[in-house]
C-alpha cells in the first residue's frame, strides 16, 4: 500500500489541469472558473491532498518561519550555523526560530512540541525518532543524517573525504601512531572511518588508540591526559570535534606535551575558535554557508507543494582539511 503523502502534482494529474491551476484554485485566486475550481477540489479529496500551510503562505505572500533545532547552544558550531541559516533564510524573506533541545529528554520533547506549533518547516541535527510525533507532517530537513535510515529530507556529511585527507597528511608528515578521541558509544561514523582508513594505509589499529570523552572543552582537557596514559607512544590524534580538540590543546599544554612537535592534533568542524588558540587548530571543516544554502533549498522544495513534507530527499555536504599549526 502506498502511504506517501499526496502532492500538488497528484491533484493536477487527477483533475487534468496544470500545477499552476491547482495552486490558483486551492488558494481561491482569480482567473479560475467555478467549474475548474470544483474539479480541482474534488481531485484533492480523491487523493487526500492536504495543502501545506507554508506553501499557501508562499503563494499568498505570508512570511515563512523556519525552526532551527540544535542540541546544545554552548557548542559554537550551532551559533555559526544559525548565523548562516538566518542570512540564507532572510534572502528569501523567511524568518528563523531557534530551538535548543537541552540535555533532558523530557524537556527536549516539550521544546520540540512548542517550536513545531510556531513554524512552517524545521532544520536540525535530529536523532532518529526525534522527528516523529511533534514533526509529523511538517517539512523537515535532517542535518548530518544517514540517507539509509532517515525517512525525511537529509543532508549527509561526507566525513570520509575529510578524514582520509587528514590521515594522509599525518602520514606524510611522518606520523604513524594516530589515536582517535570519540564522543559516542557505540563508535561514531567518524571513528569507523578512522579505523577503515588506518587499515587501508597499513597502520595497526589498537584498542588503546581509541578513547571516548564528553564532547565539551572539559572533556577534551581530560582526554589529553587519558589518551597519553593509555597510548604513550601516540604521535597524532584525530578528535571528534573542534570543541574537544581545543580542550585537548589545553590539556596537552598542562601535561607539558608540545603540539605539534610531540603530538599533532586535528579537529572536525572548522570552527572560528580554532584560529584563536595557540597553536591554531588544524581541522576537517564543513562549509557552513554552503550547508545553510543546501538546507534552505531543500526546505523550499518541501514547501512548494510538489514534494511531500515527509519526502526522502538527500544531498551531501563535503568536508575539507584546513591546515593550520597543530598538525
Residue ranges and their predicted role:
Residues 1-64:
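N-terminal helix-turn-helix DNA-binding module of bacterial transcription factors
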Residues 2-3, 65-168, 172:
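Alpha-helical recognition/docking segments in bacterial nutrient-uptake
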Residues 18, 64, 120, 173-178, ...:
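Short acidic/polar active-site loop segments enriched in Thr and Asp
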Residues 21-23, 59-72, 177-184:
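Short beta-strand segments enriched in small/hydrophobic residues
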Residues 53, 71-80, 98-107, 154-165, ...:
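Hinge/beta->alpha junction and helix N-cap segments in small-molecule ligand-binding domains
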Residues 114, 118-126, 179-182, 210, ...:
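Periplasmic-binding protein-like
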Residues 225, 230-327:
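Flexible loop/turn connectors
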Amino acid at each position: 500500500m502506498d502511504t506517501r503523502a499526496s502532492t500538488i502534482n497528484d491533484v493536477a494529474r487527477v483533475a487534468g489541469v496544470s500545477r499552476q491551476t491547482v495552486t490558483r484554485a486551492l488558494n481561491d485566486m482569480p482567473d479560475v472558473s467555478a467549474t475548474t475550481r470544483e474539479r480541482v477540489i474534488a481531485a484533492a479529496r480523491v487523493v487526500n491532498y492536504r495543502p501545506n500551510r507554508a506553501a499557501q503562505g508562499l503563494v499568498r505572500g505570508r512570511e515563512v518561519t523556519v525552526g532551527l533545532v540544535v542540541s546544545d547552544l554552548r557548542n559554537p558550531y550551532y551559533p555559526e550555523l544559525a548565523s548562516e541559516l538566518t542570512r540564507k533564510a532572510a534572502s528569501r524573506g523567511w524568518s528563523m526560530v531557534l530551538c535548543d533541545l537541552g540535555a533532558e529528554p523530557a524537556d527536549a520533547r516539550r521544546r520540540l512540541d512548542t517550536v513545531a506549533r510556531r513554524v512552517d518547516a524545521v532544520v536540525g541535527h535530529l536523532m532518529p525518532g526525534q522527528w516523529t510525533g511533534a514533526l509529523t507532517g511538517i517539512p523537515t530537513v535532517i542535518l548530518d543524517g544517514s540517507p539509509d535510515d532517515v525517512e525525511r529530507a537529509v543532508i549527509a556529511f561526507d566525513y570520509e573525504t575529510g578524514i582520509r585527507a587528514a590521515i594522509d597528511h599525518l602520514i606524510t608528515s611522518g606520523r604513524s601512531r594516530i589515536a582517535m578521541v570519540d564522543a559516542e558509544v557505540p563508535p561514531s561514523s567518524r571513528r569507523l572511518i578512522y579505523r577503515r582508513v588506518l587499515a587501508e594505509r597499513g597502520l595497526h589499529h589498537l584498542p588503546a588508540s581509541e578513547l571516548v570523552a564528553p564532547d565539551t572543552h572539559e572533556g577534551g582537557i581530560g582526554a589529553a591526559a587519558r589518551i597519553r596514559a593509555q597510548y604513550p607512544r601516540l604521535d597524532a590524534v584525530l578528535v571528534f570535534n573542534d570543541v574537544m580538540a581545543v580542550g585537548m590543546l589545553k590539556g596537552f599544554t598542562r601535561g607539558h606535551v608540545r603540539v605539534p612537535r610531540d603530538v599533532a592534533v586535528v579537529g572536525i568542524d572548522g570552527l572560528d575558535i580554532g584560529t584563536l588558540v595557540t597553536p591554531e587548530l588544524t581541522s576537517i571543516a564543513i562549509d557552513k554557508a554552503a550547508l545553510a544554502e543546501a538546507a534552505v533549498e531543500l526546505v523550499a522544495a518541501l514547501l512548494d507543494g510538489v514534494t511531500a513534507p515527509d519526502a526522502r530527499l538527500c544531498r551531501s555536504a563535503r568536508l575539507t582539511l584546513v591546515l593550520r599549526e597543530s598538525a
